[in-house]
Amino acid sequence: MAKKSMKNRELKRQLTVAKYATKRAALKAIIVDLNASPEARWEATVALQKQPRDASASRMRNRCRLTGRPHGVYRKFGLGRNKLREAAMRGDVPGLVKASW
């Protein structure tokens, strides 16, 4: 089990990313646009750098919804490998069966 503080930190990051997503996308579009003036591109770069670090989506970490485990998380299910296996063995995940050949 991950600490509550780690789970809360990730939740706070998700909210921050969602809050700044549109503004970041607009600034990145200006930076990439070759038709924009160099001054406008520079100002957009500075504005992007002044945003909070946690506003970047690359700082988010996928965690298990049940345990908060940061490694071995399946994106499709949002569960860590251990909890996914337990759920599959109970039959809680439709269409997921243990392999046998």
UniProtKB/Swiss-Prot annotation:
One GO biological process term: translation
Domain of life: Bacteria
Assigned GO CC terms: cytoplasm; small ribosomal subunit
UniProt KW keywords: Ribonucleoprotein, Ribosomal protein, RNA-binding, rRNA-binding
Gene3D superfamilies: 1.10.287.1480
A Pfam entry, by short name: Ribosomal_S14
InterPro entries the record matches: Ribosomal_uS14, Ribosomal_uS14_bac/plastid
The keyword RNA-binding appears for this protein: yes
Molecular function GO terms recorded: rRNA binding; structural constituent of ribosome
Subunit structure: Part of the 30S ribosomal subunit. Contacts proteins S3 and S10.
Protein family: Belongs to the universal ribosomal protein uS14 family.
Described purpose of this protein according to its UniProt entry: Binds 16S rRNA, required for the assembly of 30S particles and may also be responsible for determining the conformation of the 16S rRNA at the A site.
Protein name stated in the entry: Small ribosomal subunit protein uS14
Native species: Pseudomonas fluorescens (strain ATCC BAA-477 / NRRL B-23932 / Pf-5)
Gene: rpsN
